[in-house]
Amino acid sequence: MLMSTKETLGYTILATDGEIGQVSDFLVDDQFKLRYLVIDTGKWLPGKKVALSTAWISSVDPHKQVVVMNIERKRIQEGPEYSEEHVLDREYETRLHAHYQYPPYWM
């Protein structure tokens, strides 16, 4: 089933051990491939946004508007913050993948 990214803005994001926030944006690479969800951690970690790879999604329920990530809350809490002012370059991606202990998509 294909869905517009507009439809998924605001979807609730669940870690393996609880809610972490909502989808607030998407990041695509220079080949226009969707690589990351930007998550607004809202009430849980006020003011913090994080980028999580679409490869780390374990399931999506469009009826409940929920995306389940294959990551624990503590790891997200300790992870690199994302901001619109920050250039999403290979150095940032390398740190991101190393922190979450997932292999980078470019290797």
Each predicted region: which residue ranges?
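Peripheral interaction segments used for macromolecular assembly
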Residues: 1-107
